[in-house]
């Protein structure tokens, strides 16, 4: 047991306690009790702990600690994800900083992968060290890396099985393409950013001298224009892809163009003839109602192209530059039928059968970057009189979340998983309740995604990751197997047949979908037995954000069901997303990221600025970010400790909403920890030398552990606090079951701060200092008992301070155990408080009395040390009994000189008044304050505040201000008005009192 210090300093014990817990093996599954399993969403191995991690991991840790204390066999499975793209970027950047001239390409595939493994050994466990600092009580001996041998074997097995079942195929389709990374990326890695752009109107001449009568109308239906035209005006935001157009499109019911459907136009700059088609996808009111169709460079156009069997012409290469020549491909999606399992398939059906004539691009455009090409194409169009107009236009621009580059829809050969049958089963499992969403409204999001699912692109053009287990021969046939040896044996391929493994790797979500069962040894029977596959699958709950319900949650449900016949988890608890205090998403580019460790351990202003401005994708933002940081944190961030951060997170964890993280809340909960520390010091000082530690003062619990003897209260205050303890214990269990961490934190905070620290500690003082030795002894025991129980209730949320304090309190109750984290969680049935109802009601009445009189003191600015008189009038018999019963407590708590009763007919002197039920409380003013001076002061202050309210109302009634000022400024003014109004009401109340 450590030396108990006089002040709360989390740095003095948090790291020490964690090391003791881990060394003792307290985080490992016990192997007895009901299994309770949580899967940690594996963070990127490249990453550091961010607020989203801290938020979810705090809630997971609270659940694990709670169930561990409830006697469950808890397994918290942790690990890290290999993070293909992110890791390649980090290692490449590090090589550049080393200045040796090494690059990914100069090292080659094998050399670069070796470099990644070196980096992983040196830096890959950073995030796990940070998780320990937060207090994560996971079994680190089972920590898994997605590139470890066991998960890698699971990935290969899953790929081969799905391929053999016809669920995996290789085909030519449109994907998200990052032209800097030169790889396909997932939708989750694309951020759609609203930006200001242009909408260009381009003239596409009708072929063969065709003309039409163009008519326009205003909103009222009046004809505003009638003219004969020989071309269609096409509106586009991407003129650089014009070279790949294979049609122009109108709405079938747009009367302006119905006569032209089936005709052709001449594609500008190329002379190619393309058809005018109709499709309901067109919005007639957008631009001119005529749009170009470029199936190889737009996702919507791609779908149109498939519906109309349009050819697809790819005009950009993998770096988003104009190609010199290209092939016209048929508008039939490749991979539409599954490959057979015993016969090798064509490696790329689209290359074999979907390609036709070769097109030569204009020589002066070939090799140009897409934006340089845009400028040149617009200039060429203008020179030919084909550029009609350019108007400002707001559009959603897809940007890669890592490079910031505009993502290209890119037609390329990739591997895909057929999702239709898998999704139908995944939806069925949720609909029938095999998997429960909390809150339940997220089922609607899940259902929408599953009912509109597309085939999943699983290949990535990277080196780091699980290499696709497919081999090509020199004829382009593909063979899939667990190894090259298996492929050769299965297909009788001799050594004379050259096989080359596919260069691509699987995207990280492919391995992540297997996480629930690959971490339990699948598919190796021996590993499954060793790691508890049957015992720990399904897991109990998945805690995750709504942004990956489809990308991860749905895929785990589908894959786990398909490969194991089980669900991956029973509950999915969906959390909100952590945002900054203004509600903005935290991001490096915004410069508003908060590092949880900086909140825990503190950081200087200079270090904080350096952290926020180093390694920016857009260095030009550094000055702006530094300025904002210095304004928000002029003194840096003070250390708060892990517990203050954890309690803040729990208190903010409302269901399914975005979470605004305000550092001021963390400061408030640091004060809460300090309050708990000081209350414990008070209890320990007032129970020193007490006999509660003797064997007669404790008893064996049902689990065999020694538990403190239940108090036999002798005072009303003891009976009240014990009844409140039973109630808050029941509520804690209910809120854990409902995943309402916010309500749990609120209930425990209210009990600890208000009821135990503020009320019971104060109510205990008369008994502790009184002449009744039995009441004093009973009160000391109850203080210890309630505090020890409270520490157990709080432990899942704030484990460090509760452990440190409990180690001081437990011996006073005769408890021999050495750690709080393995103690039983309090149960409400352990306290029978029915007999305490009357005493509890009396104390609640006392609290109302004391609060009312304290408000009078505050209103009149009476110093705390100044004694006051109390006159009572009216009331019931029960009020008289309670006044007599609590006379000592009232004198002690309120600094009363005397208490007198007035008859109903006696005129009361000038007094401040409060009402409790039918009882009138009067505090005589004579000699207490200078009434005339206080009236004058209040009148002056009331006028000042009324003036401020008038100013604020003037601003908010000004429509120009409300409509044009930034939203934050308007809201700030409304907040000021609310504050001034509250202040005015208080001033008027005090004035009325006088």
From Swiss-Prot:
Ranges of Low complexity composition bias in the record: 333-353
Q: Where does ATP bind?
A: 588
Instruction: Could you list this entry's UniProt keywords, alphabetically sorted.
Output: Aminoacyl-tRNA synthetase, ATP-binding, Coiled coil, Cytoplasm, Ligase, Nucleotide-binding, Protein biosynthesis
Motif interval(s): 'KMSKS' region = 585-589
Q: Which GO terms describe its biological process?
A: valyl-tRNA aminoacylation
**Catalytic reactions on record:** tRNA(Val) + L-valine + ATP = L-valyl-tRNA(Val) + AMP + diphosphate
Residue runs in coiled coils: 928-994
EC number(s) for this protein?
6.1.1.9
Q: What is known of its domains?
A: ValRS has two distinct active sites: one for aminoacylation and one for editing. The misactivated threonine is translocated from the active site to the editing site.
The Swiss-Prot or TrEMBL record describes its family as follows: Belongs to the class-I aminoacyl-tRNA synthetase family. ValS type 1 subfamily.
Q: What is this protein called?
A: Valine--tRNA ligase
What organism is the protein native to? Answer: Xylella fastidiosa (strain Temecula1 / ATCC 700964)
What's the name of its gene?
valS
């Amino acid at each position: 047991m450590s030396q108990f210090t006089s002040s709360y300093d989390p740095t003095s014990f948090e790291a020490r306690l964690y090391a003791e817990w881990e060394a003792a093996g307290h985080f490992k599954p016990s192997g007895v009790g009901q299994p309770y399993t949580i899967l940690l969403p594996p963070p990127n191995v490249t990453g550091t702990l961010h607020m989203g991690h801290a938020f979810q991991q705090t809630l997971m840790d609270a659940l694990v600690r709670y169930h561990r204390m409830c006697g469950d066999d808890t397994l918290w499975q942790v690990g890290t994800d290999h993070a293909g793209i992110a890791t390649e970027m980090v290692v490449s950047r590090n090589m550049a900083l080393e200045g040796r001239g090494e690059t990914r390409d100069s090292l080659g595939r094998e050399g670069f992968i070796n470099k990644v493994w070196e980096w992983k050994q040196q830096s890959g466990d950073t995030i796990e060290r940070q998780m320990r600092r937060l207090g994560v009580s996971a079994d680190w001996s089972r920590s898994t890396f997605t590139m470890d041998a066991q998960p890698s074997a699971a990935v290969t097995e899953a790929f081969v099985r799905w391929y053999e079942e016809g669920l995996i195929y290789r085909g030519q389709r449109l994907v998200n393409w990052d032209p800097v990374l030169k790889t396909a990326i997932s939708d989750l890695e694309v951020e759609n950013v609203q930006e200001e752009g242009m909408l260009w109107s381009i003239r596409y001449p009708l072929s063969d001298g065709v003309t039409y009568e163009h008519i326009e109308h205003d909103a009222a239906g009046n004809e505003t224009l009638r003219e004969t035209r020989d071309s269609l005006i096409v509106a586009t935001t991407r003129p650089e892809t014009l070279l790949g157009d294979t049609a122009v499109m109108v709405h079938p019911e747009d009367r302006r163009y119905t006569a032209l459907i089936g005709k052709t136009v001449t594609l500008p700059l190329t002379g190619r003839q393309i058809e005018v088609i109709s499709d309901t996808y067109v919005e007639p009111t957008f631009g001119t109602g005529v749009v170009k169709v470029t199936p190889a460079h737009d996702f919507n156009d791609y779908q149109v192209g498939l519906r109309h069997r349009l050819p697809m012409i790819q005009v950009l290469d993998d770096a988003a530059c104009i190609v010199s020549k290209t092939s016209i491909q048929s508008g039939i999606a490749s991979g539409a039928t599954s490959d057979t399992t015993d016969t090798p398939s064509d490696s790329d059906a689209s290359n074999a059968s979907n390609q036709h004539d070769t097109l030569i691009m204009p020589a002066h455009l070939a090799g140009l970057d897409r934006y340089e090409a845009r400028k040149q194409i617009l200039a060429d169009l203008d020179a030919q009189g084909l550029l009609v107009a350019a108007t400002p236009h707001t559009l959603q621009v897809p940007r890669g979340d890592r490079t910031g580059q505009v993502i290209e829809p890119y037609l390329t050969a990739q591997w895909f998983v057929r999702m239709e049958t898998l999704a139908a089963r995944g939806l069925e499992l949720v609909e029938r309740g095999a998997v429960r969403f909390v809150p339940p409204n997220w089922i609607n999001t899940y259902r929408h995604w599953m009912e509109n699912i597309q085939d999943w692109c699983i290949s990535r053009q990277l080196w780091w990751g699980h290499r696709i287990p497919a081999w090509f021969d020199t004829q382009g046939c593909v063979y899939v197997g667990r190894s090259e040896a298996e492929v050769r044996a299965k297909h009788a391929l001799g050594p004379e047949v050259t096989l080359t493994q596919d260069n691509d790797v699987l995207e990280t979500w492919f391995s992540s979908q297997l996480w629930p069962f690959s971490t339990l040894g699948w598919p190796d029977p021996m590993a499954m037995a060793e790691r508890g596959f049957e015992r720990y699958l399904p897991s109990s709950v998945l805690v995750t954000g709504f942004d990956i319900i489809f990308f991860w949650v749905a895929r785990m449900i589908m894959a786990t069901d398909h490969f194991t016949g089980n669900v991956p988890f029973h509950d999915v608890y969906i959390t909100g997303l952590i945002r900054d205090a203004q509600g903005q998403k935290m991001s490096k580019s915004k410069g508003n990221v908060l590092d949880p460790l900086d909140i825990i351990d503190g950081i200087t202003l200079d270090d904080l600025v350096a952290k926020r401005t180093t390694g920016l994708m857009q260095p030009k933002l550094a000055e702006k970010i530094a300025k904002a940081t210095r304004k928000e944190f002029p003194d840096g961030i003070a250390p708060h400790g892990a517990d203050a951060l954890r309690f803040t997170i729990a208190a903010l964890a409302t269901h399914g909403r975005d979470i605004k993280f305000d550092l001021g809340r963390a400061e408030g909960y640091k004060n809460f920890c300090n309050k708990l520390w000081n209350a414990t010091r008070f209890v320990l000082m007032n129970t020193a030398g007490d006999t509660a530690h003797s064997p007669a003062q404790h008893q064996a619990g049902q689990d065999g552990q020694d538990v403190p003897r239940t108090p036999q209260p002798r005072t009303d205050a003891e009976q009240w606090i014990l009844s409140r303890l039973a109630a808050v214990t029941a509520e804690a269990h209910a809120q854990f079951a409902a995943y309402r961490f916010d309500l749990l934190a609120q209930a425990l905070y209210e009990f600890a701060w208000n009821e135990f620290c503020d009320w019971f500690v104060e109510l205990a003082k008369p008994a502790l200092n009184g002449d009744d030795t039995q009441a004093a002894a009973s009160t000391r025991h109850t203080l210890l008992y309630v505090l020890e129980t409270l520490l157990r209730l709080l432990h899942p949320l704030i484990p460090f301070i509760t452990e440190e304090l409990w180690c001081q309190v437990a011996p006073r109750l005769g408890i021999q155990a050495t750690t709080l984290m393995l103690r039983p969680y309090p149960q409400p049935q352990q306290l029978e408080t029915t007999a305490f109802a009357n005493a509890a009601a009396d104390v609640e009445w006392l609290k109302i009395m004391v609060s009312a009189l304290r408000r009078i003191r505050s209103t009149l600015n009476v110093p705390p040390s100044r004694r006051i008189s109390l006159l009572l009038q009216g009331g019931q018999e029960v009020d008289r009994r309670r006044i007599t019963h609590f006379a000592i407590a009232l004198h002690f708590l309120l600094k009363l000189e005397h208490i007198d009763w007035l008859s109903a007919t006696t005129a009361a002197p000038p007094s401040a008044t409060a009402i409790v039920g039918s009882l009138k409380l009067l505090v005589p003013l004579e000699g207490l304050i200078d009434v005339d001076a206080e009236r004058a002061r209040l009148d002056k202050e009331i006028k000042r505040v009324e003036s401020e309210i008038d100013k604020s109302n003037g601003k908010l009634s000004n429509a120009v201000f409300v409509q044009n000022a930034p939203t934050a400024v308007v809201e700030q003014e409304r907040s000021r008005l609310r504050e001034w109004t509250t202040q005015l009401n208080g001033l008027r109340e005090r004035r009325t009192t006088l």
